[in-house]
Amino acid sequence: YRLTYYTPDYQVAETDILAAFRMTPQPGVPAEECGAAVAAESSTGTWTTVWTDGLTQLDKYKGRCYDLEPVPGENNQYIAYVAYPIDLFEEGSVTNLLTSIVGNVFGFKALRALRLEDLRIPPAYVKTFWGPPHGIQVERDKLNKYGRPLLGCTIKPKLGLSAKNYGRAVYECLRGGLDFTKDDENVNSQSFMRWRDRFLFCAEAIYKAQSETGEIKGHYLNATAGTCEEMYKRANYAAQIGVPIVMHDYLTGGFTANTSLAMFCRDNGLLLHIHRAMHAVIDRQRNHGIHFRVLAKTLRMSGGDHLHSGTVVGKLEGEREVTLGFVDLMRDPYVEKDRSRGIYFTQDWVGLGGTIPVASGGIHVWHMPALTEIFGDDACLQFGGGTLGHPWGNAPGAAANRVASEACVQARNEGRDLSREGGDVIREACKWSPEL
């Protein structure tokens, strides 16, 4: 492999798709051989020379390992940079992109472990994707909500409630001051609560809360299903009853289904909330798998208006700088290379819409100052137990979150330092909000 696929003199083309792999070779296997093997196995190579190689232009189509750097502080671990010609990939297909780059190479014998740390998607390839159904600005315009983070809540217990009781919990949270409530990722259509009943009772809750508060409300109706046809049926029903947003579990549902649903949502005026169930199976190991920043990039291409992104402060794992790095990759039009935040390549999204990061998991009102400072306005903060665990009930829990959020936004706008004064801001707000 090394003679053909390790090319340290290669000049990267503007249209190349670039990958950074964290590579741990087996003892005794040279890093150059491993890097070349990764490039070969994820592009045109196979385990032996085949006569049909002579019938194609291998130099035009092969992946190339063009750089290797040792990982500081790690024994026998390297970052291998691989460049792939754009012609290897089908236009507008995240499925094909991932099948090519990570489909086969991770079981390779010469490697002890392999992790895809980052991808550079060139503008020429980005332009073949539709991206999020609507994007951040259109969502704000649809909801008529500006200048603050959006607030949500996952209805708990996530399994076991009847549709009517579920709808009642939705209504109380929305009436109390939240913008959204949410189906949990494993709420689909079980015997205790079929999807159509849930959709109807949640729609009733949304309309009742809207008429009482004068604000636009939503509930993420989970359209994830066992087949794409059933998923379309559920999303179509949501559009017919006039709700603003549906939801999809994009890793368990698959990228093909997700891209199809994103196109449906764009055509039918629905926002699309994306849950990342199963991500930790893929991204939690430090030296093997796929980093979440890659899953976030591919989701932005496939299509989603919201994506769960970790909290930095709650019960689920997430390092601050690294989390902020992939939050920027989800939202911003252009992101500079910054290794301190785990960003290996400069990424230009050339007009592809942004995805709102969703902070969810073990957060409550005392986290509000930190969340406001870390995520800024273009984020959705979701308090499940932090709303429903309020001693007075769901609506007071929702009111407490809304008051805390608005107090933090006001303090920030007045120039106060939330990292130092956050606790004081919340305590001051308590004086005029008994719920808080």
From Swiss-Prot:
Principal subcellular localisation of the protein: plastid
UniProt record, GO biological process: photorespiration; reductive pentose-phosphate cycle
Cofactors named for this entry: Mg(2+)
Known catalytic reactions: 2 (2R)-3-phosphoglycerate + 2 H(+) = D-ribulose 1,5-bisphosphate + CO2 + H2O; D-ribulose 1,5-bisphosphate + O2 = 2-phosphoglycolate + (2R)-3-phosphoglycerate + 2 H(+)
Gene: rbcL
Oligomeric form and interacting partners: Heterohexadecamer of 8 large chains and 8 small chains; disulfide-linked. The disulfide link is formed within the large subunit homodimers.
Keywords: Calvin cycle, Carbon dioxide fixation, Chloroplast, Disulfide bond, Lyase, Magnesium, Metal-binding, Monooxygenase, Oxidoreductase, Photorespiration, Photosynthesis, Plastid
Organism: Euglena anabaena (Euglenaria anabaena)
Chain positions with N6-carboxylysine modification: K182
Binding-site positions, substrate: N104, T154, K158, R276, H308, S360
Designated name of the protein: Ribulose bisphosphate carboxylase large chain
Comment on bound cofactor: Binds 1 Mg(2+) ion per subunit.
GO cellular component, one term: chloroplast
Positions bound to Mg(2+): K182, D184, E185
Miscellaneous comment: The basic functional RuBisCO is composed of a large chain homodimer in a 'head-to-tail' conformation. In form I RuBisCO this homodimer is arranged in a barrel-like tetramer with the small subunits forming a tetrameric 'cap' on each end of the 'barrel'.
Keyword Oxidoreductase: yes
Catalytic activity, EC: 4.1.1.39
Highest taxon of source: Eukaryota
Role summary: RuBisCO catalyzes two reactions: the carboxylation of D-ribulose 1,5-bisphosphate, the primary event in carbon dioxide fixation, as well as the oxidative fragmentation of the pentose substrate in the photorespiration process. Both reactions occur simultaneously and in competition at the same active site.
PROSITE patterns on file: RUBISCO_LARGE
Entry's localization field: Plastid, Chloroplast
Family designation: Belongs to the RuBisCO large chain family. Type I subfamily.
